[in-house]
Amino acid sequence: MKNILVTGAAGFIVANFAELMVKKYEGKYNIIVFDKLTYAGNIHNLDAIKDKITFVQGDICDFDFVMDTYKKYDIDAVVHFAAESHVDNSIKNPFIFTQTNVIGTHTLLEAAKQFWGEGSENKFVNVSKDQVYGTLGEKGYFTEKFWGV
């Protein structure tokens, strides 16, 4: 069975994603959820699936802890949602936003690269707010496919 790490999992949206993954892929994937439990996360958001997931409390900026998590759970894929996203808080303390959103993402990527090796076919999916796509215009559409979800 493959092991998927989902970051930011105690947030409302991500907890619902984790629940969907558990319901849709139970027996195919082990879901390991990772969260620092800051103001944006609530462990009780995961209550519906707490017996079907593995919860890891940690900081995505801590390289050694992230690498230990990859090794301990033999992570095959990462779905990275963890981010500081409240605009008002970003104005009050931009350093924390840069630390989590840039350094944290880099830490997860670097640990994945070292753990999986160069040229690996393992998956790292970075999830972000819709603003990163820019304006679509009158024609076309954005699509994303990830394990059929």
Regions inferred by a protein language model and the residue ranges of each:
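N-terminal Rossmann-like NAD(P)+-binding domain of SDR-like oxidoreductases, especially those catalyzing
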Residues: 1-149
